[in-house]
């Protein structure tokens, strides 16, 4: 079913290459990118993914450096134009993913999600978990159907993994607790980097996050657009070993990005 809908969408996207219109008033959330058709970003749904710019973290292996440290090189896409595109995709797309960067840096993120929900789309939010108050407001308002938190590493190794000495994990821990008690479908996921992650870290993350419905292990891949060069991923066999370590802690454990 997803493949059939995707084929229909691919045929229609040629008419949407120029979604910017002159004279549009910009007074709300701006994105820095729009993936018009995403088949894997939202589990089980065909979606469009909206990328916001800016992030409070500086993970050295981040594959989206343009959205984090070089925003002046990234053109902004006004919210009105994103919504206009989504209006044309009603009945074809199932959902919308708000990703980044870090979406909850955007003061109007909740308002944008409300508009998307009002259009009839399911909503997935990707976040690093650093803004529990904003996450709580979104959850309480029923503005997200699915939330993914990027767990960077064991709590002890967060500072070096996010590139911020002395980083306090308390906000991330609060976001984890919020999701666990929210009743909202969610996942935790970690991008594994050979120079930063060990089997002991995997065990520690499993114990910290245990009881969550699903945990995904993602392999680092060099996008050519990193904040810092010199990082490497693991072999598929090594990642499978990590998955076996955390399997007792979660209902579902899967690998992503393993070709």
Where are these regions (language model features)?
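Short, positively charged and aromatic/hydrophobic N-terminal segments
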Residues: 15-21, 25
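Canonical Radical SAM [4Fe-4S] cluster-binding loop centered on the CxxxCxxC motif
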Residues: 24, 42-77
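Short, charged low-complexity linear segments at domain edges
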Residues: 27-46
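A C-terminal junction/extension of Radical SAM enzymes
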Residues: 240-259
């Amino acid at each position: 079913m997803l493949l059939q809908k995707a084929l229909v969408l691919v045929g229609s996207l040629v008419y949407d290459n120029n979604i910017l219109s002159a004279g549009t008033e910009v007074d709300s959330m701006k994105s820095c990118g729009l993936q018009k058709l995403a088949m894997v970003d939202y589990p089980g749904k065909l979606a469009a993914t909206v990328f916001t710019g800016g992030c409070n973290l500086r993970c050295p292996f981040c594959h989206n450096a343009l959205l984090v440290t070089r925003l002046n090189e990234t053109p902004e896409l006004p919210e009105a134009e994103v919504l206009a595109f989504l209006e044309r995709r009603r009945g074809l797309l199932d959902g919308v993913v708000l990703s980044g960067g870090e979406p909850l840096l955007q003061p109007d993120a909740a308002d944008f999600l409300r508009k998307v929900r009002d259009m009839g789309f399911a909503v997935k939010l990707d976040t690093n978990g650093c803004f529990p108050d904003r996450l709580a407001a979104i959850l309480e308002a029923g503005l997200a159907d699915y939330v993914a938190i990027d767990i960077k590493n064991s709590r002890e190794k967060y500072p070096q993994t996010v590139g911020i000495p002395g980083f306090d994990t308390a906000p991330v821990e609060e976001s984890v607790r919020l999701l666990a008690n929210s009743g909202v479908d969610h996942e935790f996921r970690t991008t594994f980097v050979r120079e930063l992650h060990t089997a002991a870290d995997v065990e520690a993350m499993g114990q910290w996050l245990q009881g969550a419905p699903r945990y995904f292990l993602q392999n680092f891949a060099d996008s050519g657009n990193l904040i810092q060069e010199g990082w490497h991923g693991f072999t598929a066999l090594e990642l499978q070993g990590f998955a076996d370590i955390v399997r007792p802690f979660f209902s579902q454990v899967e690998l992503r990005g393993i070709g």
